[in-house]
């Protein structure tokens, strides 16, 4: 068990060293230069607003789930049915609270639309972390490690094609950048959900 944990920890470190520096110095820096200080500043401010109430999306559910699935893997289906329903309710509450906060700050129109997408991205990111907690609870550490960088890998591919090639004839701007993140999160969430369902069986949403 100790050997498995060490091996998977090394894998996690390796994939992060491989992907994240390229994201920071390759994509993120190029995005800043392409968008300009003004546009990127709008994105950065709204992104921080979407992060501000991020705790409302989880309230410790992910850690609780990871601990319980590690102890009782046979209850995955039961926990999944209940927690997914709770996560949906928390996502709605978080979204409404964040948008209300933005309105009180005077944001409107374009900024609110952009914030709405960023809020959706935070919801997806939180859901991915929850799904990964099921996989790590089932001792599927390698799969969890790969999923931990899948969204960034997809972002690198999508943004790279828009920034450096003509394969995607789409004008790169703050909107397409945020939507490319949404697409990356959606694909990652779908893949993670498929693997979780393989181990849980049929799921019926509940709020017990």
Q: Where is each model-derived feature located?
A:
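Hydrophobic alpha-helical transmembrane segments
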Residues: 112, 116-119, 146-162, 169-199
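Interfacial/gating helices of multi-pass transporter permease domains
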Residues: 27-52, 112, 174-179
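Alpha-helical transmembrane segments of multi-pass membrane proteins
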Residues: 52, 88, 92-96, 100, ...
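Cytoplasmic helix-loop-helix junction between adjacent transmembrane helices
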Residues: 125-148
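Transmembrane-helix boundary and interhelical linker motifs in polytopic inner-membrane proteins
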Residues: 2, 31-39, 53-86, 136-142
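Alpha-helical transmembrane segments of multi-pass membrane transport and lipid-handling proteins
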Residues: 18, 22, 57, 81-108, ...
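Small-residue-rich midsections of specific transmembrane alpha-helices
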Residues: 21-26, 44-68, 122-128
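N-terminal membrane topogenesis motif
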Residues: 1-23, 77, 81
């Amino acid at each position: 068990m100790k050997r498995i944990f060490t091996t998977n920890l090394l894998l996690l470190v390796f994939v992060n060293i491989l992907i994240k520096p390229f994201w920071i110095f390759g994509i993120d820096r190029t995005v800043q230069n392409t968008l300009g200080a003004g546009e990127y500043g709008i994105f950065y401010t709204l992104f921080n607003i979407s992060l501000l109430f991020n705790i409302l999306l989880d309230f410790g559910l992910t850690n609780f789930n990871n601990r319980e699935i590690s102890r009782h893997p046979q209850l995955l289906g039961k926990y999944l049915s209940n927690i997914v329903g709770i996560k949906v309710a928390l996502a709605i509450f978080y979204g409404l609270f964040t948008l209300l906060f933005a309105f009180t700050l005077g944001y409107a129109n374009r900024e609110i639309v952009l914030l709405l997408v960023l809020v959706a991205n935070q919801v997806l990111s939180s859901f991915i972390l929850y799904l990964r907690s099921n996989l790590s609870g089932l001792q599927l550490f390698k799969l969890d490690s790969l999923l931990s960088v899948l969204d960034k890998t997809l972002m690198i591919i999508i943004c790279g094609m828009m920034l450096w090639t003509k394969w995607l004839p789409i004008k790169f701007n703050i909107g397409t950048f945020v939507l490319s993140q949404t697409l990356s999160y959606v694909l990652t969430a779908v893949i993670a959900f498929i693997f979780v369902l393989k181990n849980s069986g049929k799921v019926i949403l509940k709020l017990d």
